[in-house]
Amino acid sequence: MAMLSEKNNVSDVMFQRLARNNVKKNMRHYLIYFITLLFSVSMLYTFNSIGAQFSMLNMSDRGSYLAFSSGMMASVSVFISLILGFLVVYANKFLMRRRKKELGIYITLGMRQKDISRLLVKETVIIGGLSLIWGILLGIFLSQGLSLITIKFLQIEGAQYRFVISPLAVVECLVFYSLIFFFMNWRNKKMLAKHSLVELLYADKKNEEAPDEKLAGKFFMLTASVICMAASSVISVIDGFNMKYISVSVVVLFIGTFLFFRSVAGILLFLLHKKKRLYYKDLNMFSIHQVSSKINSTNKVLSVICLLLFLSFTTISVGLGISVSVSKGLSKMTSADAVIESYRENSGQEISVKDKLEQLGFPLEKLTSSTVEVDLYEQSDISISSFFLPGTPGKEKLLKDRYKNMDQPLYVMKISAFNDLRRQQGLEPINMDGQEFLINCDVSEISKAYEYYAEHGEAPIEINGHSLSLMKNGVYQMPYQNVNVLSDMGTLIVPDEAAEGLESFRSLLNCMYTENSEQMEEAFMDAWQELNDTGLRIATKRLIITEITSTSMTLSYIAVYLGIIFLICACAVLALQQTANAIDNTARYETLRRLGAKESSMRKTLRTQILVYFGVPLVLGLLYSVVGIRVMYTELGNVPADVIAQNVLFASVMFILVYGSYFFITYNNTKNILKLDRD
């Protein structure tokens, strides 16, 4: 037994040493796999640490909005983990395909499949463990940067940066790695059991085959591809951000991209062949045929990669803009620290909200420095459509898509109540005579229609028997309630006497705390929770801000998260394809070397091939992104040009770092494979 134990220990030491040596020897193969796993783990940590990052914002989570956002991000991470899992498995499959001959040699030397599987497990533990550790460290660093960017862009009051580490995110990364580890080992065992010794030994002799088509057909496909690309751009902007047209646009774009890659290589080969001086210069003939052959054989993959790059750059560029757009509109969504609302038709009460609270024993005077109660009335015969004149810009679009119920009656508010709200918000009251009215609207598209009416409408309107004309510059966008969506499509501000006799169906009590602090918010809400069956509804400023901020920030994170993952997927596939191509071309480069080709010329040839293979999908993807970014930011609306520029710059930096890293790693990797690192 002692001898057997000693033999097993020696075997373990031998396998450990062999695994380390194999990792070192195959580092040029493992490098892309290592970088892909490292980036994957770092992204998982960065975006799963969102719960810890929320703690920097110093926002109350009474409504559990931050917890919901963390859960939403965790759900998205499950989907992302599946994508990354398949990507890592794809990289591992490529690695095993390139090592089949080596594994076949192990079998000829008498090593059992069980021992080979054991060896592969140890290799995976070494390379996976290193990428896991470095990935988590990189994720911790990136999460701090993401926190700083979030605080800067959202400009949340009280937000303060501090260094945080999320133990939960670390655990999630470990779970992801463990699942990938077991799945890869299962795949490796299945691969070894499936292939015979002959298949393993001669696996490196198999190459991809490219379709052969006539030149006229290629010119036709290229023309069709250009038409599809142009049509896609036109379709995407036909009707603003209409998902039906956007979906059609993406499908047409993919078809155009596929036709482009299916045809362009053969056409360029034909055209360059006519340029004899260029074609026969140095190793250009070899380079041109290599690039043409590779693009022809991988046109479907390149089409998908091109769209991934387009989606990646667009989502990263627009992602942070979502939060900025929403944060810019926060001031329009809240009018006071707390707004208590009553629907008279529901509660059946005739007393005011303030009197109702006093009856219930709510300490309103103690908790607030000022209160303003306003009644909203309804004029049944005046609706939004009453102000839509012929020629109103965007009228058809508004009626068709977004605001189909244009016959909805408008709210009516007394000018005295409106001025009380303005004073509470630190604004000057408005002087208006008895024959005028104002319109308050916070929906920008509808507000533009009212402004057009102010310029071109002359006929007065009839309100409760009073003939009123719109006051000059009488369109306002002042909030008078706390809401999570801008929904005031028009409130008529009329002289007090014009509202006399109208039935009040809704009352709002705008409250300002005695001090603007988290403690006062907690005290107010604790007192509110003690009330039972009030028939009233409450919306606090901090609760609304927390809800909107957490939702918009989560959407921004998801957009950037997906964008970076798409980028990693595209880069990894490109890198693996080129590495596989280099291994397949080892004999061809040896032939060039025997024919007297210079090492510098062969390096230039290799660099050109990789540059074209990486560059063409990137250029196309960025061109597509120009249209995509324009459409998205047009829909988002109030995002300043300098913020858009910053977001695009951020996306560009991400592309330079990730895309550039994969490019240089691929070039150095293939250069070592082809032994072109010698002078």
Model-predicted segments: where are they?
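Membrane-embedded alpha-helical segments of integral membrane proteins
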Residues: A230, V234, F241-L278
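Small-residue-rich transmembrane alpha-helices
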Residues: S42-Q53, Y90-F94, I127-I156, A169-K194, ...
